[in-house]
Amino acid sequence: TGTVIDEAGIPVIGANILGKGTTNGTITDMDGKFTLINVPENAILVVSYIGYLDREIPVAGKSTLEIRLKEDTQKLDEVVVVGYGVQKKVNMTGSISNVKADDLSVIPSTNLSNSLAGRAPGATITGNSGLMGAKSEIRMRGGFGDPLFVIDGVIRDKEAFDLLEPYEIDQMSFLKDAATASIYGSAAGNGVVLVTTKGGTKNQKPIFNYQGSYAFSKPTQELFADRWDAIDDLDYQNAVARFQGTPLPNGEEEYAYFRDNKINYNVNDYIWQNPWNTKHSLSVNGGTDKVKYYVMGSFLAEEGSYVSLENKKFSLRSNLSVDLTKYITMNVNLDANQSNDKRFYWPFSDDDDQSVYDLYRCTFNAMKTTPFYSYLDGTPANTITDYPIYQDYGSWQGWNPVDQVVGNRYLKTRRRNLNGIVSFNINLDFITKGLSTKVMASYLGHDYNRKRFMTFQKNYKFQQADPQGNRFLPAPLNLNEYNTFNFSQNYENLEYKTKQLWTEQFNWFVNYANTFGKHDVAAMVVFEQASNGGEEVSAKGESPLTNLDQMFNYSSDALRRWGEAKEKNGGRLSWIGRFNYTFDQKYIAEFSFRYDGNTLFPDGKRWGFFPSVSAAWRISQESFMEPTSDWLSNLKLRASWGKLGNNSIGNYEWQALYGSGYNYAFNSNKSNGLAMTTFSNYALEWEETAITNIGLDFGVLNNRLNGTIEVYDKKTDGILYRPTLPESLNQFTSPLQNLAGVNNKGLEITLGWNDRVGDISYSVSGNFTYNKNKVTKYKGELVREWRTDANGKKVWYQNVGTVANGSSNLIVEGHEMNEYYMMNPYKGNGSYFNS
């Protein structure tokens, strides 16, 4: 028997007692006591508990033991990544969600954002497309756009974030309130995601780690296109005829033809496959007493559910740290990656848009009574041939959905990124204790190449052997009866697009941290300067001589050749500060600010000041809480307020823009000219968000059960939006203006349990997020008045003609974003209209 207590003599409830090398074990009761039978005199007991250091106790013939556990100070000193540094978790005053990299590495996802669903309270992860390679959308606390992504201290875009491998991540933090995010000022209006990558370990021999996986997906139920067969098509065609009062097109002869011959032309037989992906990574880390290194290379390949979808990704990372002297450490980080994508060309969505839902719709609706391909003699083919057969789709006459996926037209993209970071950490303790400085420089290069090959479809007409009888009996093809489907394009074409972008960033840090008795103080001041620019070139050729996908194959006529070039540049300058004060490890206060200047805005509007204040009270550390110390491990109340900005706009949005093609004839001679296409707006300024956050952190049973409850109020004003211009100005694009405001309020709850049984550790966690928004400013309030419907009946019409143009999900003051509006029926009249 025995008792397990902590350093203060308080019983430890639920501690694990296990005979070393055996399965003989037990746990302590509510008084910290335990009883273990069948224990040899020379046995060694292993005593463990979450938050305490393990102990091995020799029994040595004793029948009663008192075991004292020491707190694991490493747990107490756990730090989390914050803006421009790290902080002890127990001293945090703001709202941060941390995601463990180990939790992400077990998910067979091909990009990082898809792995985050449900793992970061306050962050909503939404998949917008099932297309291979499609990225999920990340929205934090009702934000309108992507959060700011910062990787190893350098601002990056979401593409770079998604290219990260879980294996190379050390820590990931979601900064959700102003206390944590305002230090990023004008770019933090939609929240901040911080990532630090892994480094090496001093005095460690090289450790190699290989991670490999193969994953595939298979439908758990029958696809919709497989459920509907040719008989269903015949029934549907007859039902339409009955509704229209016309003769039925299908009789027993047609039904017998498909039923008895088991004929069913299924689009999925041609284009569908079970998607798969394979991932491989190899890393090595280690170090000496002065050098630490971490190197990782990875490869990903995947194919989508359609046969012409391919994606490959290559990544390389090298993180090196060298102690040059006793006081100076140099860090060199290098990150390079490349992704190659290929898919069928779909002209009705943007080239980089992963949503091709209208193609899905067309494939689902493909008729089962007409073959997709045939041989020259008219025999329907179960494979791809040179004779695609067209199907009629309402206004899309003469189209073949299978040929769109498996045909020769395509879209290829290649993206490459190179990021180099060099920093020097200088310890200035020889001047005064706790003083240090750091300088950091980074260069980011990005290039994007896209090749788009577009050809028309040439589809042949299905020939009927018996037009007066069974109209589905095939006859030999007539090669003179075909349809050319041009996808609303005038000419077949080939287009190239290339972009080269760069960003340079320089930071200078001055840090100070010290303790004076019960007073802990810390301060940081940062100067940051960044510049960016890039060039974009596009070229297009039309009217090819053959089907070869090379530019020399296209017409040299100047009217059939097209080219465009753009360039951009900009810069930003910032002063950043953070000051922390803690008294007696109970009372914590923090003030931070960022003073931002950015060329995205006009003179006089370029600078913005974004402060935040926050405080926390560690209630569990108070003397009056001692009676609860045997079960209450942590109780902390915190509150924060601050302002954030949003600069997610393009270059030159405030300037008047001009375009070519506006010509005039002088004396019968054509003169080329330029004309204004976008109005200027010299009043354009920062979109600002003020956030108030109150949180309660708690832990019981030595933090085996822990959680957080938070409420927030997020008010955004000056939201950038393009107003609708009068018809008389239809040649112009309206400038961005600060027109709208939105208020988001919400609740977040996180609850987790972690424990250990013998050598097995386990944890369970869950989170709940609720967010409700209301439009506080947008073109005026909703107007209600009586109107009549198409039948002359009175309806209560919600008139929103001044705030939107016919959409059923609208933005209206006093209502939620994108609410759906319908007419209230009047006296049973079931008519409704999109307001």
What do the predicted segments below correspond to?
Residues N209-R259, R756-S835:
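Conserved small-residue
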Residues T1-R317, T329-N331, N337, Y393, ...:
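Short, small/polar-rich motifs associated with maturation and membrane association
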Residues F243-I263, T278-K279, D351-N400:
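Acidic, glycine-rich flexible loop segments
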Residues I13, L36, R55-E56, D157, ...:
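A sequence-level detector of short linear motifs
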Residues L104, G145, K313-S315, N319-I328, ...:
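Extracellular/periplasmic, surface-exposed regions of secreted and cell-surface proteins
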Residues V4, G19, I27, L148-I151, ...:
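Hydrophobic beta-strand positions
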